[in-house]
């Protein structure tokens, strides 16, 4: 065995011993709710397709029309020949929905964050980031030479202290947070963060991947508050409630113009395929016209938390923290045998000691299935959580 294979094998053996090795299981979703895994048909509570739009006829028809008219791929970077008119139309729609001046489409949410952050801050700058922020926000900080300070989850007092102590020593400051936290389902205290950031001349960026389409009348986490706070940098993805693929940033026109000329993940990545832009536009049509659809995922999550006697869900994401890897793997297998797919979440995705079942509720889940799920989950929960 050569040194490369030996290295990989040793890493895999260590992960296997700690119950942290991950493997891909072939699966396919039939209709946005039901999924076939290893030949077994399961009701999924793991998918981020919150509005069940991946199989919606309007999205499929829009994508098919775009493929037949424009082809499958963009063919080049947006700065070369990949800037299809549908992308600019989508940017205008997203900016209007999010209440910003302009928008920039990226190839994926991960590409957005790893492009935006190093474009904005560098050697003489400061980044503050929530300890539970998504991995791609942390990845973006690693691509910048800026000084990074991590603050305790949603801890306003620590943010205030860090900025009061450090802000004067840096040229610019950027605060990074999720709008809706992907593993905990709670919302960031955006009004308080916005006020502190304004006071200290710190730029606030919210990753709203799990907010668009399901929170704040579909406009995202900023609009969950009244009045909506000013968030100068609103990032998100097109792969969750939108049902497709891609990422975006909504911001002022000067910021967006800077992204389109300097963000490396725009400049050096092929543009988003026209079909994905077309399906995203169809999704926005539905989000803007069907308020009942938008409300349903959160209502379903709250039906689940009410049945279990938990605090009301703040988003379609509900975690049940079991602690150990062994406990969460066993619980996931129990749910599997009962016909439910609920993916166990283990470190390093979540901190050590907080392995959990992560439930994602969609518009299509039926009340009777949610109540049945809750009844199966109840005996699996730690006593202190009941």
From Swiss-Prot:
* BP GO annotations: biotin biosynthetic process
Q: Which residues cross the membrane?
A: none
Q: What are the UniProt keywords, alphabetically? A: Acyltransferase, Biotin biosynthesis, Pyridoxal phosphate, Transferase
Q: In which pathway does it act?
A: Cofactor biosynthesis; biotin biosynthesis
Entry's Gene3D superfamilies?
Aspartate Aminotransferase, domain 1, Type I PLP-dependent aspartate aminotransferase-like (Major domain)
Q: Would I find Isomerase among this entry's keywords? A: no
Q: What residues bind substrate, as annotated?
A: 22, 29, 134, 349
Q: A Gene Ontology molecular-function term?
A: 8-amino-7-oxononanoate synthase activity
Swiss-Prot/TrEMBL cofactor(s): pyridoxal 5'-phosphate
Q: Which residue positions does N6-(pyridoxal phosphate)lysine occur at?
A: 240
Recorded hits in Pfam families, A to Z, give: Aminotran_1_2 (PF00155)
Where on this chain does pyridoxal 5'-phosphate bind? Answer: 109-110, 182, 207-210, 237-240
Q: Briefly, what is this protein's role?
A: Catalyzes the decarboxylative condensation of pimeloyl-[acyl-carrier protein] and L-alanine to produce 8-amino-7-oxononanoate (AON), [acyl-carrier protein], and carbon dioxide.
Quote the protein name from its UniProt record. 8-amino-7-oxononanoate synthase
- Native organism is Beijerinckia indica subsp. indica (strain ATCC 9039 / DSM 1715 / NCIMB 8712)
């Amino acid at each position: 065995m050569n040194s490369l294979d030996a290295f990989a094998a040793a890493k895999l053996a260590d992960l296997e011993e700690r119950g942290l090795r991950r493997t891909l299981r072939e699966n396919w979703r039939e209709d946005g709710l039901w999924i076939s895994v290893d030949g077994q048909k399961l009701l999924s509570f793991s998918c981020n397709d919150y509005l069940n739009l991946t199989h919606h006829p309007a999205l499929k028809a829009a994508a098919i029309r775009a493929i037949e008219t424009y082809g499958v791929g963009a063919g080049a970077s947006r700065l070369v020949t990949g800037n299809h008119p549908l992308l600019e139309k989508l940017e205008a729609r997203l900016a209007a929905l999010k209440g910003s001046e302009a928008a920039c489409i990226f190839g994926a949410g991960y590409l957005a964050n790893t492009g935006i952050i190093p474009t904005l801050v560098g050697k003489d700058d400061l980044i503050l980031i929530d300890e539970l922020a998504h991995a791609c926000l942390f990845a973006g900080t690693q691509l910048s030479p800026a000084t990074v300070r991590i603050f305790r989850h949603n801890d306003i007092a620590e943010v205030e202290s860090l900025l009061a102590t450090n802000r004067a020593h840096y040229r610019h400051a950027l605060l990074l947070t999720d709008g809706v936290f992907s593993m905990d389902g709670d919302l960031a205290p955006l009004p308080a963060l916005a006020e502190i950031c304004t006071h200290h001349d710190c730029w606030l960026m919210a990753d709203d991947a799990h907010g668009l389409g399901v929170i704040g009348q579909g406009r995202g986490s900023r609009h969950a508050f009244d009045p909506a706070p000013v968030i100068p940098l609103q990032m998100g993805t097109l792969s969750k409630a939108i049902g497709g693929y891609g990422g975006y940033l909504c911001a002022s026109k000067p910021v967006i113009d800077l992204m389109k000329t300097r963000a490396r993940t725009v400049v050096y990545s092929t543009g988003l395929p026209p079909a994905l832009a077309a399906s995203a536009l169809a999704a926005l049509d539905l989000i803007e016209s069907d308020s009942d659809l938008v409300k349903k995922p959160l209502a379903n999550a709250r039906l689940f938390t009410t049945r279990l006697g938990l605090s009301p869900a703040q988003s379609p994401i509900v975690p049940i923290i079991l602690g150990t890897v062994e406990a969460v793997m066993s619980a996931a297998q129990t749910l599997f045998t009962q016909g439910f797919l609920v993916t166990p979440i283990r470190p390093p995705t979540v901190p050590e000691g907080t392995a959990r079942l992560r439930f994602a509720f969609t518009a299509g889940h039926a009340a009777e299935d949610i109540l049945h799920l809750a009844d199966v989950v109840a005996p699996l929960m730690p006593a202190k959580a009941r």
